[in-house]
Amino acid sequence: MDTLKVRDAKDVEEVVRAAIASEQPLEVIGHGTRRAIGHPMATNAVLDVSDLNAVTAYEPNELIITVQAGVPLADVQSLIDSKNQQFAFEPMNTSVLLGTSGNGTIGGMIGAGLAGPRRIRAGGARDHLLGAHAVSGFGDSFKTGGRVVKNVTGYDLCKLLAGSWGTLAVMTEVTLKVMPKPESERTLMLSGLDDVTANKAMTAALGSPYDVSGAAHLPNSAFRSATGALAGLAAQGPAVTLLRLEGIAASVADRATSLARTLAPFGSVEMLQDTASAAAWGAIRDVEPFAAGGALGNWPVWRIVCPPAAGGALGQAMARETGGDVIYDWGGGLIWAALPPKSDAQAALVRQRVEAAGGHAALIRAPEETRRKVAVFHPQAGGVAALSQRVRHSFDPKIILNRGRMLLIAAT
Amino acid sequence: MAIMMPAADQAVLDRRGEIVTALRAIVPGEGVIDSAAEMQVYESDGLTAYRQPPMVVVLPDTTEQVSQVLKYCFEQGIKVVPRGSGTSLSGGALPLSDGVLLGLGKFKRIREIDFDNRVVVTEPGVTNLAISQAVAHAGFYYAPDPSSQIACSIGGNVAENSGGVHCLKYGMTTNNVLGCEIVLMSGEILRIGGKAAENSGYDLMGIITGSEGLLGVITEITVRILQKPETARALMVGFAEVEAAGECVARIIGAGIIPGGMEMMDKPAIHAAEAFVHAGYPLDVDALLIIELDGPGVEVDELIKRVETIAQGCGSTTCQISTSEAERNLFWAGRKAAFPAVGRISPDYLCMDGTIPRGALPKALARIRDLSEKYQLGVANVFHAGDGNLHPLILYDANKPGEIERAEAFGADILRACVEFGGVLTGEHGVGIEKRDLMPEMFSEVDLNQQQRLKCAFDSQGLLNPGKVFPTLHRCAELGRVHVHGGKLAFPDIPRF
Amino acid sequence: MKTEFSLAQLADPDIAVADKILRACVHCGFCTATCPTYVLLGDELDSPRGRIYLIKEMLEKDRPPTAEVVKHIDRCLSCLACMTTCPSGVHYMHLVDQARVRIERDYSRPLAERALRAVLALVLPRPGLFRASMIMARLARPFAALLPASNAAATPGLLRRIKAMLALAPNSLPAPGPSGGSVFAAIGERRGRVALLQGCAQQVLAPRINQAAINLLTRHGIEVVLVRDEQCCGALTHHLGHDGDALARARANVTVWQKEAEQGGLDAILVTASGCGTVIKDYGFMLREDRDFAQGAARISALAKDITEYLAGLSLAPSRQKGDVTVAYHSACSLQHGQKITGLPKELLSKNGFVVKDVPESHLCCGSAGTYNILQPDIASRLRDRKIANIATVKPDMIAAGNIGCMVQIAGGTSVPVVHTIELLDWATGGPKPGSIGQD
């Protein structure tokens, strides 16, 4: 299979047009770190944008950064970190879960749209993408959005690009919003709560005025494979519920006291400060308990999103029924579930339970054979599915880009 | 009217009687309005420079009625223009002479308040403020607060992706909406999203938000609610020069402080607002910054100190800090009513809406001053300084010949300048008809075609709100054609491995 | 907004006033948010902005009002919530008053409706006739069940309206109070002298309101006079568009009050029915073009005070209330929007030992609005039910209001005692505990 390493947007246009002309679908990659997410693709060549890796403009005072899509995410993160800024949505580092090396490119970050714990407060990748230049499946370069946050000029195509897994257009340059890093952080921990009670504790915390920026729950079984930051917590034994507070030091201290009082009905709290706190949240963000290199490395992993107050009951029931392990983030609204290996990853059961709770489930990690026969992304209701297809066609009528990745049956 | 609208379909107009009868069968009672005198009140929204009575007004009560009305219009090739509270400042609800004006004003119920999931499920005709009021007893509120929030509908907010003073810290409508029920032009009713933080598949909710009534008619919305911050206090800081105020804004953001809201008003705006609200606005400063800091008490106290220091460092001449909730609201009352308060100093005004990078604020204001000279029309400036979103209010008197045309030309020049300075045509009011013909300033034909193709996915016949946002209408078939270039198999000069 | 009056039209002083009002409107739509009919019906035509538009069209084209225009203007409560909300200072009241006059003059209503309105205009302002009609209503009430109930018809029919009227009549009528010409001396040192508006409907339905006012005032050294030959203030006929009748009453009242002021001296003309207070304070505007009465009317308007305004300036005797009575304060539209008196009555009650609760959606009318609850019974009852549900959420022991119309309207749908603010203040400073209205 040919890999076409493009140098600029013009190259991208040419490659796409050639692909259209010859009806040869393309797999679009940056570093290819997330290739194993989605269905195995029905593509004939690889379009590699990793050479589009310049930082076009970084304006800390404007809270924006414009980069080419192939820039390594890690490089951008250290650049903005040097100015005490961050991507507030805490993009997940998929290398831990997938066992790849490196965390890929900015384009991949956007296409995957996997946001971390702070999504409950700061939103997701889609809330931070301000503008983009991209090449559509028509082979045309187009731009959408701009370089400012307040922008309602025309349709918000950026929202479609985020989380589209490269199926709509090939991003060449994007503008993202950056936010100041908080001065300090602290994590309150409750121990020994069952999933449903933990869910209630997280709900109480998120319904408080103390500006909680992370709410996660790790049942004790999640610690069987604890490594790194969570190893220390494993010493606690029972389950751990974590609530994060960020901001200026005096405020964090004050809020911690208030929040502890609010959580008193659930038990007494212990505190993690600064680096220890950050390490724990990094581990939650990257789903370390289910790391590819860990004890559950060969278990399929589901990423379930549901109404937050329903998460505890949903996860607990599912873990019991499937024999799997779950960890909770987003106050109960995001559940990672690792299930004992079965050829269909127990998809029918998982999806039925999840739908009943008002959520959806994506099979983020699974062997290729499984991903060939099980719908990776949650099947949509008839009308919405048809609309989504029409939307896709409006960008890529010949289904040239990442054909077969999002839908089980390769669409024509 | 200066703006061209799509040509009226005479065949449809000829069948008006039959159409009205058919619509009455779907929406009984007073919901179908077809007398010229009554339809006239619907001829304009908040942008009174443009007026057009519709062919007929329909005010449905239920989603099923909306679906049947759209289905009927789809089958008959009749255009439809949706309307919320009619407070749009970009002409989004301007009717078409051969179209149905579909008003969602009867959809006034809040369907569900779910504190555990921190969402409210509401009908689109509920006002923005009513949502906050409905959850206030539990200490919650709905964050996006456009200044017209007392009257604007949440459905309209979703259509325009409305902002407001607090969107600097809490995001715009699109960052606060989780799902909706939408009726497509075909009559098909779809449910998008729900109470979960994100949807599976493409972010359809994200594309529907800000689509200005062109992609579908929204009949239910699920919004996020937040717990009110422990405390909120406002500083009102005066500067002798606008540039100093702009510098202060930049420095506050540069210091890593994201205020709950940061607004600027210039002298004419200050005077108009003060006349209405009597909040004690200083009348001798050139620029007034109202900065709100919210959060836990300890944090707010600290941030107030930091902001005060920064303001003094930029040469502020006055500084007042609110000491009570009532006082804080009073500081804001004038700013929030600034647009219509300007009605006291001028019979008419054109409210512009453009965004520029914060750093370009002084440049933009200087250009607006020059244009004011050029066009011989006064202008009062109110803006969301925190995110560079300008609202120059061009003052004119429609009763004086030529003034409205000069006002529009002035406005267009301001928007062109916004794009020139690296910004965009509209920050929160939408393109509507007002800025439609300026779209080519920002987007190439290819860009616009891509957007129009998306429209085709939702409304293949182009019957929903045509004539808004996009300056030219294309047939979907024409847009959908893929041009095969050259037909070459591979390009030799691209490195491959 | 842009207006299109010709110079000839603008020569008419009423049109000149209308033009000024219309040009202040910028069509922002804020007013729709607080308009009770828009809140209920969701139709721009039944919003202040829509009505302004309809009136503008009618005045500019100088055409007779059409049935549609009349329908929507008739639905206006004149609650004036829109004026409180409007940031541009549009004087909606003066505009809609003009429209009503024009409708009365140029529009031919159906016979039954004309007859009903004529009867209302004749009877309500005349206490003798009103008293007689209330007695008859009590006799006719058993037959009300035979009359049509609420339906979704665009315009209520005559029978529907009669049914509404019967429902409003009280079970029993109290004995009449003191007549015009009575003077009530101050107890102890005389510190002031005021006239107390006798009213029309109020003196028949609840003379105890003014009795409480007299008790309270005299107790605090204020001499109270009930001016002889005083008439109904004209609000009722004014709002029916019968300008001639309303202005005649205004003139008559200005005359007798001026005479009283000259002869005995008056510090104020006190009003216990806020619906009247708003109109009396507008006498100056209403008679501005009348060379003989303009000045006098302006002076009278300046003298007119709602009773709570006047009491705020007195230091009241220490209260005997122990803080165990929770009062839901119903803010009458004429008081909060018409006269901009919002916090004062609540402060008075609270300072005098009552636990005062605000009612949710307090800016929304209860639906009484003069004769509205008779002429627009369906909208009025929806508003009443909404108001009562809102009041119920604060679980009050009593409901206090400053306007007789509101009191009757609300009492018709709740068993919580409904009293006038002044009755509570009288009770606090030594008077009797008030019962609910209609239960004397």
Regions found by a protein language model. Name each.
Chain B
Residues 1-497:
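Noncatalytic alpha-helical scaffold of FAD-dependent oxidoreductases
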